């Protein structure tokens, strides 16, 4: 089985796949909309980096209703963006960018979401992108960073990985399917400990970061530029 690719085939099954694979994914998406309602600055831009089929983009849009914010949805998969576009009416205040998130030029942004996206970048590229995002965010704005993490304590890692595998079995995946997906993602999704992510955020210039969600080995952080 080859490496995992976000192609047309994956785009067609993505909502089902991610909800069966990521615990509380829909809750995370909904809460990102809530966070946007709290922290997006009126009249600014909100970026969803690695937007896939746009669930997070739409949650941000809903959370910023009446604030004159524009949501900029970025993905490097044309298949993903095309399917997202087909589900959105023209009047909705969403701009689509087919681009590598490392190449995005951020403008007037106060809210950025990296919802299970950073983990697909090479390790050496992550601090550079976080620094670029920090420097572009308006004071008072924030970054939401969701990641599948690993753990410094091997026993803790085994605990969470085992529970995650059981979660997928409960959602209809066979042990063979779980093993095949793990193999496909092995060289594509590169996990880091939560502490490393928080260290990267601090080094990028974010004044503070908090864990607002965790289920098994899935974590979401919010980092502020004060």
Per-region residue spans from a language model:
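Conserved class I S-adenosyl-L-methionine
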Residues: 144-170
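A short glycine-rich, Lys/Arg-flanked "PGG" loop and its adjoining helix->strand segment in the class I
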Residues: 127-139
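Core SAM-dependent methyltransferase catalytic element
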Residues: 204-226
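A conserved beta-strand element that flanks and buttresses the S-adenosyl-L-methionine
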Residues: 113
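Class I SAM-dependent methyltransferase SAM/SAH-binding core
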Residues: 47, 52-103
């Amino acid at each position: 089985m080859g490496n995992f690719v976000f192609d047309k085939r994956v785009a067609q099954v993505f909502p089902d796949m991610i909800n069966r694979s990521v615990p509380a994914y829909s809750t995370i998406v909904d809460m990102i909309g809530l966070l946007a309602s709290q922290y997006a600055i009126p009249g600014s831009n909100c970026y969803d980096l690695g937007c896939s089929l746009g669930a997070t983009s739409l949650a941000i849009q809903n959370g910023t209703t009446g604030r004159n914010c524009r949501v900029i949805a970025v993905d490097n998969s044309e298949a993903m963006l095309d399917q997202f576009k087909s589900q959105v009416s023209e009047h909705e205040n969403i701009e689509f960018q087919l681009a590598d998130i490392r190449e995005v030029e951020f403008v007037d942004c106060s809210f950025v979401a990296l919802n299970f996206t950073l983990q697909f970048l090479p390790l050496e590229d992550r601090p550079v992108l976080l620094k670029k995002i920090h420097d572009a965010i308006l004071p008072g704005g924030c970054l939401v960073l969701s990641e599948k993490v690993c753990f410094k304590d091997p026993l803790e890692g085994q605990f969470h990985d085992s529970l995650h595998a059981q979660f997928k079995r409960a959602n209809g995946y066979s042990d063979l399917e779980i093993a095949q997906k793990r193999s496909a993602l092995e060289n594509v999704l590169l996990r880091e400990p939560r502490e490393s992510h928080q260290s990267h955020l601090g080094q990028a210039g974010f004044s503070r970061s908090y864990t607002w969600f965790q289920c098994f080995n899935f974590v979401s952080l919010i980092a502020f530029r004060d």
